[in-house]
Amino acid sequence: RFRVGERVPELDTLAAEKGWAWLSAFNPGSQLLSESENLQRHQALLNNLVNTQRAFLPAASGDDTGQWPVEHAVCLLNIDEITARALAIRHGQAAFLHAQPGEAVRLCWV
């Protein structure tokens, strides 16, 4: 578990070349969808990552207050912010998280 503004040394080690990003395809544009719709969107994201041979780890996202549902997500390894932004846009997201090796996690708006 981590927060925006914190460093995550474990992920820095796994993504030492370009950094890493945290991305979900759930609830595009911050609009709540059904579980079924969200799972379809998540599968489309996974298919895209596999087809492009992008390295990733399964992940989940949520807020500490519980006001927003937990979302399936991915941690993309060795990905620059520009490429992560393109993926976020492709999958309808308003924002994603990104960190350069050795730097704090940043919230990146698309």
What name fits each language-model region?
Residues 34, 38, 101-104, 109:
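A generic "folded-domain core" signal
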Residues 70-73, 77-105:
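Short, compact, well-ordered microdomains
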Residues 43-57, 93-94:
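Structural alpha-beta junctions
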Residues 27, 47-50, 58-61, 105-110:
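Mature, function-bearing regions of proteins
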Residues 1-47:
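N-terminal, charge-rich interaction modules
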Residues 50-80:
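Mid-chain, well-packed structural core segment of small domains
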Residues 12-14, 66, 86-89:
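A general structural signal for short secondary-structure junctions and capping/turn motifs
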